[in-house]
């Protein structure tokens, strides 16, 4: 083991689940999990709220010994009969990969007349981005995405892994979960800054559908600033370029921009697509250096740790994440106030409009008392 490598002992995201979410982003209609009935249950159920059917071959002890080829063929045919999908996904699990299941043989035998994205993956990878990459490689082979988009996604995955290892939940051997600072106290401090006429940046650097809730914080800050007559002191940035990303990701950006416009909130700087959270921070840093170096504070939502500290150090930082294990790394980076939106992800699945956040709701209520 090299000096830079660490052995992480807190639970880490699963490559199997990452593959499932990638199939969702590709607008796959049905994903078949080839493995035990309980594998990835929570996320499989949540994904069904987001428009993708997730079914399982339900391998048991007999299947572990004798294999599940026939069962996979059966479930492929049953899925086509039940759901009439335009694109089908087949995803491996620890069990099916350990026993050496050849999923491709089952797909050939079933011979569906639609594209099939086969993802041979298990949860034994240290970086869950491997599941994304495997799904994208198969999507490329199936003609669902082109080489240019694949290479773009591959680059983003490399950068995402780097960010997590340097400043995220993969940066330490063990990170205890935390709820962060009290939202009420931070809301009061933010209102003080606005009342004092301080100039602030509101930066949304969100990962895909999580933006539906992080965008509400941009709305709330804008609403409160407007009520105080200080809206002109804010500059809003967001990674909501609707031309970048896989199909579902581009759609998220379109919906969030639509809602910003409907609420009269101007996004002054578009900093990238909703899958570009690992690299959008570089653009933010450049913008601050060139145009906003005299600003006093920043409210950063989504993946704050992906934004370099170089041009933020002189600002008071209020950062909101949905990762309880992200609090300590952000504090160590120099983020003075760190908040956690608990259970954000389940609340942003299957939606197509901005969802109220805990901090947004708190800020609005505190402002009424100000």
Curated annotation (Swiss-Prot):
InterPro entries xref list: CfbD, Nase/OxRdtase_comp1, Ni-siroh_cyclase_CfbD
Gene Ontology biological process terms in this record: methanogenesis
Keyword set, alphabetical order: ATP-binding, Iron, Iron-sulfur, Ligase, Metal-binding, Methanogenesis, Nucleotide-binding
The protein, known as: Ni-sirohydrochlorin a,c-diamide reductive cyclase complex, component CfbD
Organism expressing this protein natively: Methanosarcina acetivorans (strain ATCC 35395 / DSM 2834 / JCM 12185 / C2A)
Reactions it catalyzes: Ni-sirohydrochlorin a,c-diamide + 3 AH2 + ATP + H2O = 15,17(3)-seco-F430-17(3)-acid + 3 A + ADP + phosphate
Gene3D superfamilies noted in UniProt: Nitrogenase molybdenum iron protein domain (3.40.50.1980)
Enzyme Commission number(s) of this protein: 6.3.3.7
Superkingdom of origin: Archaea
Molecular function per GO: ATP binding; iron-sulfur cluster binding; ligase activity; metal ion binding; oxidoreductase activity
Organism lineage string: Archaea, Methanobacteriati, Methanobacteriota, Stenosarchaea group, Methanomicrobia
Enzyme class: ligase
Keyword Chloroplast: no
One Pfam family in the UniProt entry: Oxidored_nitro
């Amino acid at each position: 083991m090299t000096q830079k490598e660490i052995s992480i002992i807190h639970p880490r995201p699963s490559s199997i689940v990452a593959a499932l979410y990638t199939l969702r982003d590709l607008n796959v209609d049905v994903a078949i999990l080839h493995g035990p009935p309980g594998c990835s249950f929570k996320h499989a159920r949540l994904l069904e709220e987001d428009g993708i059917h997730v079914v399982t071959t339900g391998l048991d002890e007999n299947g572990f010994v004798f294999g599940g080829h026939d069962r996979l063929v059966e479930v492929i045919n049953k899925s086509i009969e039940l759901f009439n999908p335009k694109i089908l996904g087949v995803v491996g699990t620890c069990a099916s990969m350990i026993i050496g299941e050849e999923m491709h043989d089952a797909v050939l035998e079933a011979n569906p007349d639609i594209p099939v994205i086969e993802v041979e993956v298990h949860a034994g990878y240290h970086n869950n981005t491997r599941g994304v990459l495997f799904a994208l490689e198969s999507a490329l082979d199936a003609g669902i995405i082109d080489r240019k988009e694949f290479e773009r996604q591959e680059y983003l995955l490399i950068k995402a892994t780097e960010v997590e290892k340097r400043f995220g939940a993969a940066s330490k051997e063990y990170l205890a979960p935390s709820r962060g600072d009290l939202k009420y106290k931070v809301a009061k401090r933010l209102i003080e800054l606005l009342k004092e006429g301080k100039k602030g940046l509101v930066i949304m650097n969100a990962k895909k559908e999580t933006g539906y809730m992080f965008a509400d914080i941009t709305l709330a800050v804008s609403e409160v600033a407007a009520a105080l007559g200080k809206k002109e002191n804010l500059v809003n940035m967001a990674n909501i370029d609707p031309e970048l990303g896989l199909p579902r990701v581009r759609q998220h950006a379109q919906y969030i921009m639509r809602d910003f416009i409907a609420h009269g909130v101007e996004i002054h700087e578009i900093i990238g697509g909703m899958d570009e959270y690992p690299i959008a921070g570089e653009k933010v840093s450049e913008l601050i250096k060139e145009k906003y170096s005299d600003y006093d504070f920043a409210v950063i939502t989504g993946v704050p740790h992906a934004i370099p500290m170089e041009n933020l150090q002189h600002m008071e930082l209020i950062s909101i994440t949905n990762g309880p294990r992200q609090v300590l790394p952000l504090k160590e980076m120099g983020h003075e106030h760190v908040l956690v939106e608990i259970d954000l992800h389940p609340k942003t699945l299957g939606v197509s409009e901005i969802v109220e956040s805990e901090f947004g709701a708190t800020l609005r209520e505190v402002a009424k008392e100000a």
